[in-house]
Amino acid sequence: MRNLKFYICVLLALAILAGCATTKFDVVSKPGTDLTKCDNFLVCSNIEDAVFKADLESRFVDKLTANGKKAVEGTKAKSDSGSDYILDVKLLSSSIKLDHKKIGPAFPVSFKLEIGESHEVTEKVTMSFDISVTDTKTNEMIFRGTVTSDSEESTEAGCVNAIFSSVASNTVKKYFVK
């Protein structure tokens, strides 16, 4: 019974860790630019899939508004949104890597022969984004960066969900709020 509790704790810890995404930044910005002082954003994305596009834009809007900024999704905005800045999130690349791991015999065998084996397949999705901020008054790009994030989940949708959350959350936290 003690071993069962231990294994359950280990499985829960692995489940929590598996839902994480790592995010890396590489940015340049106009000298003197402080995005923490910017407000009122129009968030746009170039993703063709309407569901993913709306999801990514809404993640940034949610994170910005939760941190006291005004923001509207490009998919919901009219042609003149009245925004002071345009936050443009473009998908540069995405890739999926499948890992195939042997996790042991499929059933207990009393001999040294392994009659059946159990395997686990995990997906690692990596996505890179170009993120830019343009001042609508001067039509000048004041910030531009590349963000790369990856995640390992049991499904592609789970990976994309973790990546979108990580990219939006980490970008807003790192550059848009103090």
Task: Give names to the regions the model predicted.
Residues 48-50, 92-96, 149-152:
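Solvent-exposed loop/turn segments at secondary-structure junctions
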Residues 2, 77-80:
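A general structural signal for short secondary-structure junctions and capping/turn motifs
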Residues 15, 36, 81:
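Structured loop/turn residues at beta-strand edges in well-structured enzyme cores
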Residues 20-36, 118-178:
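C-terminal/domain-edge helix-coil "capping" segments
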Residues 80-141:
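Surface-exposed short loop/turn segments
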Residues 19-76, 176-178:
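A structural "domain/chain start" motif
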Residues 1-20:
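Sec-dependent bacterial lipoprotein signal peptides
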